[in-house]
Structures are given as structure tokens and as C-alpha cells.
């Protein structure tokens, strides 16, 4: 409701709707914190909506990192997860299904009411949220507020999800027979093959919860989003991808990598938690001589592939830092951990401060699953990559790294010891690797320019703040 003549508009109240699984909520919280700081002069307040378990994890992470307390104008608001109270242990896919069913059945509307109550009755003026939670679009409309979704993955993957119906009509049931066919008839996707598409677009179980979710999201975004935040920066996406997205989503606002939004002295890169001594170990290694290995918190190679990877790292002769869940250590070759520790040639840890590790001058190669957050952290650190994708959008990301941007290599299928050794050797010391390293430095410079004073990502984030707060 517009204010009466002579009355001032109430300050903005932004509801931030999280997808409470994997790293999604943490990424959205980093944006919310930056938004809260930027919007404070307008008197804006933010309500961050997520489930009890998600908020508990975020609080734990915040307390473990210096400077990560919530701004005074940002509050947590707990929302139901949709799971029956009697069920103590629910598999994650089922948790996602229950959460989305609750969201679609009017849950988001109730969450916005909870945000209003937590804000002392201040109505929600804008709904920002993870694009995965597409039912927020209708809830925002019912509240008379715009919906501004945040996309956390690559632009090419978003384009594929939006064009899913057209891709399915084109490929039909022939995906297995057309895996190497380039998608030349689909604007923005000509650099990718059928095999590179995310799971559930033209192959896999279309009814799996995540595949259903992103399909509905892709249908919803073009008709309902007031603007869409993109996790990219000018100069990264090829012009055909940018043009194709702009035609479908005219109000795209790119200001990624999102982890760079917070000021340096406010981020954990200033004094990162490093309980396993990764940075001290790196300080004893040669410049650009270390291979850093991490597949994130979800993806993990099969036991035989883990052993091949370990053997390949040893065979490369390069020092390595490997972040690997401790429950997988028993799968490594006999004596591998002892040899690495005894010679000082390798360090295996259950967790590493990845951003700080990639920025360390001793790291010269990154062996990764090609999750988008990891790709952007590598790009912003100028580190070339060897990608072993597993699922989701990781195949598209790996294709981008190796064939679109040219600052790394991609394994086609499982890693072998010989393949790992060759990839690490090439990235660190090879002739082709030199070109990849140079390309990585070019992209790193583009990121630095975009986030520098007057840079395009800084300008775009200011525009995002204006869109969110003017409602």
C-alpha cells in the first residue's frame, strides 16, 4: 500500500528465502550480509528465512570465523522444514522433497508472515531468494512484493535449465546416441555437447526431486522474476551465453563471484580458520609448485578412483595438499598417508580453508569436481584446474574450463593414475599448461578489475541493492 500524501515510505523490509541444503544457504547468507551493510543507510532490515538445522549450521560457521557476526539489521527467522516430527532420520533427497512440497503448498506465504511478525509487523517489501525455491514467486506476488531470485551456479547451466523443454523436444529419447553432438541449434549452448548438460535436462530421472525443482524453476523465472542475480562477472561468459540469457531474462544482474562481495577485512580470508596447518605447510613449498585437490563436501570418487588419484599424485612428483573427508582415508592405497607424511611431499586433511589455500603463492594447480563455487574460487585466484565432474552442472563447468575459457583440462570419465600424473605435470610445468596458467591470470585480472573501485560488479551490486530496496 502506497503511503498517503505527506507520509514517508516505511523503510524496506527484505525477506531472504534460503534453500537449506548443501552450501546454498551459506552462499545466500554472504549476499544477505553484503546487502544488509549496503542497505543500512536506507533503514532497510532483512529477515533471513531458513530451517532450524540450516540456521544452526550457519550460526556455527559464523561463530568459528572472526568478523562473521550478523549485521544489526539482519535477523534469522526459522521456518518449518516440512518433515514429520516423528521422523528422526530422513534421507537428504526426501528432505528436499518435503521442503519443496511444503513451500509449494503455501509454505512460503506463511514464512513471509513469520518474517513480518519477527519485524514487528513491518510488511515484506521485496523477496530475495535462492532461485531453487521457485514457489517464492507466487508468495511474493501475493504479498505485493517483487521476487528477485539469486542464481548461484553458472550462467550456461541456468540457460540449459530455462531451455529444458526445447532441449527435450530436440534430443528426445536419443541422448545416449547423441552424447557428443554439439547443441548448435540452441542459442548460447553451441560450445556444449549433449553429454555436458546437467542431470535431468535430457537424460536421467526427470522425476528426481532436484531435476523436477530446476525444471519448474526454469519455467518460472522468465515470467515472474523482477531481476535475477547471476554468479558471474563481465568477460567470463561468452557473448552468445550473455545474449541468450538477456533475451530471456532482460534484467540480469551479474555480480559474482559472490564470495568477493564482503570486504577483505570482513571475510575469513583475512585470518582464516586453519585447524590442520594447511597454510603453514604451504609456506614451506615452492612457488606455484603444489597441486591442491578437493571435491567439495558432497562429491566423492569411487574407492578404485580414489586409489588411482592417490597413485597419480605420487607419480607426478609434485607436492600436494588434499582435502578429503576422513571417512575416506581408509580407502587410500596402503602406506600412502605414511609416505606423504614421512617425505613431507603431501598433506591430507579432512578440511582446508579453500579460498586462502587457492590464493597461496605455492599453489599452482587445482584438481576439482568443478562445482561452480570452486571454479570461481580458482578463477579469482588465478589457478589452472584439472576437472573431474560427477553430477549436476559440473560437466558443463568442466567443459567451460577446458574448452570455452581454456585455463584447465577435464577428465572424460574416471581418473586414472597416469591421467592424473599427466594433468598435474602439465598444469604445473608443461608447455600447454603455460598457456592455461596465462589464461587463468587473465581471468583473475578481470575479476580484480570487476571488484575494484568503480568496477562493473561493484556497480551491478549497487544496482541490485537499488532494485531490492526501492520496492
Curated annotation (Swiss-Prot):
GO molecular function annotations of the record: anthocyanidin 3-O-glucosyltransferase activity
Superkingdom field: Eukaryota
EC number in record: 2.4.1.115
UniProt KW Transmembrane keyword: no
Biological process per Gene Ontology, one example term: anthocyanin-containing compound biosynthetic process
Family: Belongs to the UDP-glycosyltransferase family.
Protein name as it appears in the record: Anthocyanidin 3-O-glucosyltransferase
Species whose genome carries this gene: Zea mays (Maize)
Gene that specifies this protein: BZ1
Amino acid at each position: 500500500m502506497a503511503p498517503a500524501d505527506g507520509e514517508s515510505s516505511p523503510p524496506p523490509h527484505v525477506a531472504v528465502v534460503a534453500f537449506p541444503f548443501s552450501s546454498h544457504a551459506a552462499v545466500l547468507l554472504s549476499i544477505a550480509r553484503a546487502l544488509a551493510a549496503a542497505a543500512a543507510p536506507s533503514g532497510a532490515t532483512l529477515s533471513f528465512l531458513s530451517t532450524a538445522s540450516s540456521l544452526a549450521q550457519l550460526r556455527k560457521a559464523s561463530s568459528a570465523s572472526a568478523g562473521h557476526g550478523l549485521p544489526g539489521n539482519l535477523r534469522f527467522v526459522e521456518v518449518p522444514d516440512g518433515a514429520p516430527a516423528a521422523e528422526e532420520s530422513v534421507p537428504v533427497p526426501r528432505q528436499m522433497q518435503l521442503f519443496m512440497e511444503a513451500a509449494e503448498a503455501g509454505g512460503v506465504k506463511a514464512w513471509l508472515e513469520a518474517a513480518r511478525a519477527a519485524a514487528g509487523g513491518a510488511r515484506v517489501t521485496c523477496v530475495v531468494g535462492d532461485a531453487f525455491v521457485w514457489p517464492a514467486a507466487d508468495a511474493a506476488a501475493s504479498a505485493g512484493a517483487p521476487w528477485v531470485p539469486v542464481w548461484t551456479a553458472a550462467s550456461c547451466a541456468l540457460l540449459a535449465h530455462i531451455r529444458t523443454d526445447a532441449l527435450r523436444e530436440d534430443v528426445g529419447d536419443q541422448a545416449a546416441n547423441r552424447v557428443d553432438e554439439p547443441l548448435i541449434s540452441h542459442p548460447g549452448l553451441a560450445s556444449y555437447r549433449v553429454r555436458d548438460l546437467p542431470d535431468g535436462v535430457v537424460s536421467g530421472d526427470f522425476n528426481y526431486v532436484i531435476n523436477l525443482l530446476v525444471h519448474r524453476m526454469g519455467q518460472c523465472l522468465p515470467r515472474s522474476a523482477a531481476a535475477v542475480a547471476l554468479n558471474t562477472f563481465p568477460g567470463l561468459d561468452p557473448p552468445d551465453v550473455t545474449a541468450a540469457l538477456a533475451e530471456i531474462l532482460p534484467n540480469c544482474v551479474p555480480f559474482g563471484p559472490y564470495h568477493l562481495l564482503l570486504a577483505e577485512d570482513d571475510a575469513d580470508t583475512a585470518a582464516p580458520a586453519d585447524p590442520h596447518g594447511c597454510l603453514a605447510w604451504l609456506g614451506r613449498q615452492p612457488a606455484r609448485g603444489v597441486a591442491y585437490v578437493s571435491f567439495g563436501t558432497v562429491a566423492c570418487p569411487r574407492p578404485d578412483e580414489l586409489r588411482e588419484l592417490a597413485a597419480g599424485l605420487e607419480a607426478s612428483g609434485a607436492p600436494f595438499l588434499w582435502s578429503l573427508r576422513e571417512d575416506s582415508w581408509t580407502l587410500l592405497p596402503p602406506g600412502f598417508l605414511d609416505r606423504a607424511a614421512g617425505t613431507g611431499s603431501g598433506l591430507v586433511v579432512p578440511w582446508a580453508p579453500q579460498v586462502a589455500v587457492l590464493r597461496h603463492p605455492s599453489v599452482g594447480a587445482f584438481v576439482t569436481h568443478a562445482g561452480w563455487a570452486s571454479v570461481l574460487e580458482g578463477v579469482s585466484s588465478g589457478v589452472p584446474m584439472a576437472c573431474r565432474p560427477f553430477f549436476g552442472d559440473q560437466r558443463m563447468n568442466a567443459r567451460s574450463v577446458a574448452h570455452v575459457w581454456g585455463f584447465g583440462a577435464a577428465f572424460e570419465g574416471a581418473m586414472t593414475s597416469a591421467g592424473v600424473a599427466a594433468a598435474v605435470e602439465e598444469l604445473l610445468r608443461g608447455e600447454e599448461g603455460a598457456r592455461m596458467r596465462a589464461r587463468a591470470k587473465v581471468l583473475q585480472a578481470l575479476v580484480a578489475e570487476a571488484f575494484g573501485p568503480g568496477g562493473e560488479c561493484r556497480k551491478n551490486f549497487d544496482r541490485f541493492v537499488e532494485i531490492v530496496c526501492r520496492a
